[in-house]
Amino acid sequence: DRTASDSAALDSTIELLVRTKRSLPMAKLMTIPEAFAHRRDFPKKLKDLYTYANAVMESWDGPAAICGCHDQWAIAGMDRNGLRPLRYTLTNDFLIAGSETGMVEIDEAEILERGRVGPGQMIAVNFKEGKFYKDKEIKNKLSQSRPFGEWIKKIKHIDKLVQSVDEEFRDIQTSDLRRRMTSFGWTSEDMEIILHPMIASQKEAVGSMGDDTPIAVLSDNYRGLHHFFRQNFSQVTNPPIDSLRERVVMSLRTRIGNLSNILDEDQSQCDHLQLNSPVLSINQFKTLRQYMKDKVKIIDTTMDIQQENYHFKKELDRINKEAEEAVRSGYVHIILTDKSLSKSRVALPMILVTSSVHHYLIKKRLRTFISLNVQSAECLDVHYFAVLIGVGATSINAYMAQQAIAERHKKKLFGQLTYEECVERYIQSVNNGLLKIMSKMGISVVSSYRGGCNFEAIGLSRNLMSEYFPSMSSKISGMGLKGLEQKSLFAHNKAYSDDVINLPIGGFYRYRKDGEKHSFEGTSIHILQTAVGTNNYSLYKK
């Protein structure tokens, strides 16, 4: 039921699991597991159990304190962050669980134990055994119910598969790289203010608050599609997370492969590749491609502008149909790539393509059968990665950003850092940024953020939103698909018709004479100061 609440969806999922012979404690553990990835004090058997549970299905983040009863079990459990109160009272005859200790009047002489259920924990009663289980006891019981340690050996880790440093793209011609960058709207400002600090400090660049530039739809310059989206933040129910001090409960681990039947319980559910992060280097993406073998369908996301009657709508329909046919033909992975970009082929905005394919496959009820991997030249800053993941991307390779790093490294702009270290620091800075963005929504794991569309569009038409971004809202309507096409073609033709020696200056973050317009540019401020100093009203009006 699409109109049902999150709580109703969770209830329905747990009900489905218990009706297929899984115990209620196991159903709770699979749907709302404890944070374990960064904890060194976790017993191996419990780690094996949670690793298996994460391989079977994506987890709920909460906040939630749940109580349930089915068959011979009654349970009470908490979400991984412990963001709801849950206390219990055990008597000679009863177990009472709820948000407060004193909900029910009980004779103190009857009370055996009082306590609280912590983050990710649960308590349980088995009616058949007549036994009360604390958190460690019930989880030890579950961890011994199946050979989970043997099953999870089928999970492959990408770091163990990477064998050598990939030299691909390292020697790309500077002129060709400049044209590609210009066609996507990159500027020298992006290189100096965005990319360089990410490698130098392993963090996003820090800037002052406020934005006095036009919103993307009103700008005269080409702005990437990610500029049309604003990140949502938690309000009322979901408290934000501190991504620095509460890192232990957060994870970017990503599984690559078909989601198996969640109703099964065997080792086949662990046959997939695990990534430590959805952000991949060129070398890691090449390794991923080798792992996929013949189970991958590569879809070109560029458009031939030499053919007659070309337009974005036609290309998006083609891409969607190719994706559907791939799933129905038994492919397990899809790669969306714009590597075919050339003078005669313009790249469609990757955010638009990814969202289109993701939602199209959801409508056809095929999305869970495939991983949606993106190889994008447009991707540079953390916000772009966040939007791509938010509209459904499983993994992302920003290959042109890595080419830009290689070019700057040749010029010795990163000091004593090796090229490999620069790439690692760039990916780490993106990872840190993704955790920060997720934390603003109170989301702990990237699988909960993926496809969640936690953004609000500004300046995109409602027809465009309803067709390609149906899970998002656009409070201010504006540019449609035709407008995006015209902007992309203008930037592309400009890049490939002119002799591009240097990137455009930009002027988005700092005012430049030939760059983006600013409300508070130098000339206006100078006139204002002069008008105030000379008490000149006519100059003030100017």
Where in this protein do the model-derived segments appear?
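N-terminus-centric sequence/structural signature that marks the extreme N-terminus
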Residues: 1-19, 78-82, 89
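Catalytic cores of alpha/beta
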Residues: 378-392
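Short, ordered loop/turn segments at secondary-structure junctions
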Residues: 128, 339-341, 377, 393, ...
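Short beta-alpha connecting loops at secondary-structure transitions
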Residues: 1-2, 104-109, 369-374, 403-424, ...
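Conserved catalytic micro-motifs used in adenylation/nucleotidyl-transfer and phosphoryl/amide-
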Residues: 58-96
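Alpha-helix-loop-beta-strand connector modules within alpha/beta enzyme cores
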Residues: 346-372, 425-432, 436
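Flexible, glycine-rich loop/tail regions that form catalytic "lids" or insertion modules at the edges
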Residues: 17-64, 68-72, 99-103, 131-313, ...
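Conserved, mostly hydrophobic/aromatic
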Residues: 123, 338, 388, 445
